Amino acid sequence: MFNKTPEQQQAIRNTIKLKMEGRETLTMSDIKTICPAVSTPSPSPELRKKLGITDRYVHVPTTQVIEDIQKLGWNPIEACQVNARKRKGYQRHMIKFVNPDFIVEGRDEYPELLLSNSHDGTTSFTLDVGIFRLICSNGMVIKTQDFGSMKVRHYGYDFEAIKSAVTELMQSIPGYLKQVEEMKQQKLEKDQMLDFARKAAMLRFAKTNEESIEKIVDLSDFLESTRKEDDGDGLWEVFNRIQEKVVNGKFQYAFGKKERKARPVKGFKQQVKLNQDLWELASSYVPEAVVAG
């Protein structure tokens, strides 16, 4: 990239962006171009001191983990990193993977793996499971009591460590897909839909309460469908309508008399957390007897 003109560099980035929008497999060169933090070299002693990285921290480039996950059948399709000044090159970043074996013809949903990491000594490698929905090109991240994120430490990292984490998550995927089917079967009453919308809005506006939130957002607007596939009173449809608006900012809100258009949640860490909390909220509307089955 460094021997390219600015115009050529932008053209390369645009091509990679189109690949990500089409959910095509990214090359390592693609990933390094849009997410340079994946290949940052081990910090020098001086930089370790400046960033507060302890001597116990063992540097494992994310590129190595990406290659290891690919060996397990998962292809990288998206990459991003947070903006940073002080920790530039060592900041948090995320890679998203899909496995062709889990893409079933005729099914609208399939799982994703989300790998997040940083090279500043503040985080372990973290793997989350997501569900991608073809209808709206929207992704959600799962959070349940039974299965959580998998963390792999830098210290003592080897292929078997990531293989074990990925294998354990893969074993949980059928259970997640079963939860999706249970949500599709669960119908909600009008008051339950409003309750869902209210609690979801409070996740987006964390400093609100049940009394104040309805002065900020129109809950009925949260429940409006933007596509026919999301029509209906099923929990899955209601969840998808609300999730898309809360995460992508497709709603109006007001503090006082001034009305504003909500913006999408930008940071991937915030996106993952909000998606996980929304999934947990949706799961609470499935009767325990159904979940246990």
Each PLM stretch: what is its role?
Residues 1-91, 195, 201, 292:
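N-terminal low-complexity, intrinsically disordered segments
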Residues 1-23, 101-293:
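Intrinsically disordered, low-complexity regions enriched in serine/threonine
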Residues 79, 95-97, 115:
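Generic structural hydrophobic/aromatic packing signal, biased to beta-strands
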Residues 86-102:
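Charged, often glycine-rich, active-site loop that binds/positions anionic groups
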